[in-house]
Amino acid sequence: MISRHRVLVLGLGVSVVTTAPAQTLSPLETRIKAAVAANYDSAVRLLQRTVNIGSGTLNLAGVRGVGQAYRQELDKLGFTTRWASLPAALGRAGHLVAEWRGPRFATGGKRLLLIGHLDTVFEGQGQRFTRQDSVARGAGTADMKGGDVAMILALKALKQTGALDQIQVIVIMTGDEESAGRPLTVSRKDLLDAARKSDVALGFEGGDARTATIARRGASGWILTVKGRQGHSSAIFREGAGYGAIFEAARILNEFRERLSTQPYLTFNPGTIVGGTDVSFDSTAVSGTAASKTNIIAKHLIVQGDLRSLTPGQLDSARAVMKAVVATNLPGTTATISFDDGYPSMPPTDGNRAILSVFDQVSRDLGYPAIEALPPERRGAGDVSFVAPIIDAIDGLGVDGFGAHAPEEGVYLPSLKMAAERAAVLMLRLSRAPRPATSDR
């Protein structure tokens, strides 16, 4: 799930490699870089093939089809793969899980968890893969089939050079990142189980040449329900008639804005509102209907929105403010608010910063730009946030693209090579770093 502003506008084929001089690659790392280049064309073909499989979250067959295509690639590399099905009641396809333990993996080295996802926001009809020079367009090219393919390309280069023998890694590609199945304790169980057997998580959501993600805001939901006294509009505001549901909702939303809108990293958005005398609302589909007349005081209103925060404490504080605002009502009205726990936040930690430092050095050693942390407000929620409380994590290792969650979605194809090179060398270096004997997580 991508939500970020582009940091660099480029035609990635040339300009990114001139920003920083290469430092020192080992002979093995040099061979890894060459192996990525040798497999680039086949990776583009894999991207084309899987983009052309429609895989909106609720297209279960399509999600499984994309998963099968990637599973075949991982099978060829010697991974032990399985399809983790979910209960039918969740209405989700399941996840691809693949594991590898290299025969020369050093005991005590860092164990890696690689995270991708198979589903897209849009179904894909009318958004098939098209290519013009170094730019490809289509549903999922950037978010995040491009990142999945970059991950596979990196693993293939490690395998062909023998470096994969030094690595222990679990790959999880979820089938419902864009709309996670509920309850989350069920739909994210395989991801959490994998995290508990790992030391570092690497997320392959879209990235760019100069940034990576060490913090992501969490995303949760809320529903505001307001009731008023139905009556003739000529009596509105008078004792006995009151203010009506719509005026009370307007007051509440405006007070939310006044009290919360200036907090750093915190945002809230009322995405859908229906109100009147006769109201129906489907919170799952986020759609509803309303009917009334202009001379009737509205008796019912529903608002559904989201709330994004950087830390659990910030989320709790914001919810407390919202509850307090809702509890004090205009005459003749009542209101309630409920909250839905969605994607957790991923606060910045020293461990995440340490991974960023290694990634920065990898990028410069390969001749790419230095890497800095992307401001958390420029990144949406994602699966890596579920594992961040358990292990150190970094995200944004995927391809550089544009138009995510929009019909014009596309990717700069040379970034596929850049992402794979950087990920492969990063995996090798992290695997050689000893994991701490104790952890405060």
State the predicted function of each range.
Residues 9-17:
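Bacterial N-terminal signal peptides
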Residues 24-139, 159-164:
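Acidic/His- and Gly-rich active-site-bordering loop/insert found
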Residues 118-132, 215-226, 361:
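Acidic-glycine-rich active-site phosphate/pyrophosphate-binding loop
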Residues 1-9:
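Bacterial N-terminal signal peptides that target proteins for export
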Residues 144-219, 275-285, 435:
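Acidic/histidine-rich catalytic neighborhood of metal-dependent amide-processing enzymes
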Residues 18-22:
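Sec/Tat signal peptide C-region and signal peptidase I cleavage site
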Residues 107-173, 179, 194, 407, ...:
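Active-site metal-coordination/substrate-binding segment of hydrolases
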Residues 23-31, 38, 55-56, 223, ...:
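Metal-dependent amide/peptide-bond hydrolase catalytic core
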